[in-house]
Amino acid sequence: GHLIEEMLLLLVRLSGHTVSHEQAQAEVEGIVGSMDCKIDGVLTDVKSTSSFGFKKFKDATLAFDDPFGYIDQIKGYAKSEGDTEVGWLAMDKQNGHLAFLKYDLEDTQAPVYEVLKEDIVERIKHVKAVVQQPEPPEFCNDPVPDGKSGNMKLPIGCSYCHFKRSCYPDLRTFLYSTGPRFLTEVANEPKVQEIT
């Protein structure tokens, strides 16, 4: 990811655009992070994605399906910087395609406004309160069917979560040609290697 980011920012500069604020620190409610950059003054996060994930940037549907929290992340940076225009420069790492998705957090006429309007400060306060609770929170997402096998698997966002085994202690991992698949229920044993 870091090499792709550096390559893309070099290409952005070579094409005549201005890149600034690289890895500038941002802070909101005690949460500190480093933004990727601003391109021509627009707060920008650089992403390398699979072909499947790339569609969300190309089709401008990220706001409606954001399992990795990219929206909240960039809203935090925007709050820290006092910006309202944000964007993602995404590269499909399988095909080399590029897309730039730009949202204006204050554009009340935009189709994504209802999804984007939640105040990031309130969101951060809520998450901090949830983390302080003695009991773990409800599951973020429910398992989904794994095709027609009768098995249930973690949704994409949960499959990357470091706490998936806390939520699902009996989780089983099977190694498919497309990568690991995390099954919460096994009705039919997959005919691929299980990772223990």
List each language-model region with its residue ranges.
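Generic beta-sheet signal
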Residues: 22, 46, 89-91
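Metal-dependent nuclease catalytic cores that hydrolyze phosphodiester bonds in DNA/RNA
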Residues: 1-43, 50-64, 68, 183
